[in-house]
């Protein structure tokens, strides 16, 4: 929705992740992916990916009025497709950029964004949310355990460099934290980053290597 995009750009909304990026939608009686990016200084923007041979001329995006927003609906795409934005500057230079609002990203050394359908995700933390509402975090004691999942513990397996998945680490980490007397966990480097150092390039995508 254009008005919602403008509200976000003017600081009246905090839900940019609902407006920008790649969203699976039902449009014109078919499944499509809606791409949107904010590039106010661009001369033109196009969509590139494994579906068009990374050709900057194949899939141009449409500017939304003079807002600096570029948008495009693409039918026939599936989950797990690689893509980037090809941004043409006013000097004619073409820059290939990952989507800052992507919900998934390619594992290093690749730097592409990845289409992901999050519509079917079901939250199951209602009991915890209810219990949290009955506490006063300002008055309650707090002791934070800061941890990087990739180096906290590893398995003796070659795939994924031995990393635990989120689900595998959840119970062991919770048991350890409770045993040590901590009240909270702060996960380091959980937003996607393309290199071993934590240089975040995508705040909407959690690190892929721990997914499965």
Question: What is the role of each PLM region?
Answer:
Residues 143, 159-162, 193-212:
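Aromatic- and acidic-residue-enriched carbohydrate-binding clefts of CAZyme catalytic domains
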Residues 171-193:
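Catalytic domains of carbohydrate-active enzymes, especially glycoside hydrolases
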Residues 45-47, 83:
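Short beta-strand elements bearing conserved aromatic residues within extracellular beta-rich modules
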Residues 1-34, 64-146, 151-159, 168, ...:
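The feature marks proteins involved in alpha-glucan
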């Amino acid at each position: 929705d254009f008005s919602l995009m403008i509200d976000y750009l003017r600081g009246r909304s905090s839900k940019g992740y609902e407006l920008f990026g790649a969203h699976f939608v039902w449009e014109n009686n078919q499944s499509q992916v809606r791409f949107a990016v904010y590039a106010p200084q661009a001369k033109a923007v196009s969509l590139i990916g494994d579906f068009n041979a990374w050709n900057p001329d194949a899939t141009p995006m449409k500017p939304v009025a003079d807002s600096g927003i570029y948008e495009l609906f693409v039918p026939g795409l599936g989950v797990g497709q690689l893509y980037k934005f090809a941004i043409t500057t006013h000097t004619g230079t073409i820059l290939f950029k990952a989507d800052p609002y992507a919900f998934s990203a390619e594992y290093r050394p690749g730097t592409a964004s990845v289409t992901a359908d999050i519509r079917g995700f079901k939250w199951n933390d209602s009991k915890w949310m209810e219990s949290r509402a009955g506490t006063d975090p300002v008055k309650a004691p707090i002791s934070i355990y800061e941890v990087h999942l990739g180096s906290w513990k590893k398995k003796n397996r070659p795939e994924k460099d031995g990393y635990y998945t989120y689900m595998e680490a959840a119970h062991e980490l919770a048991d350890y934290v409770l045993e040590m007397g901590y009240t909270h966990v702060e996960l380091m480097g959980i937003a996607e980053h393309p290199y071993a150092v934590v240089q975040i390039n995508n705040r909407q995508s959690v690190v892929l290597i721990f997914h499965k």
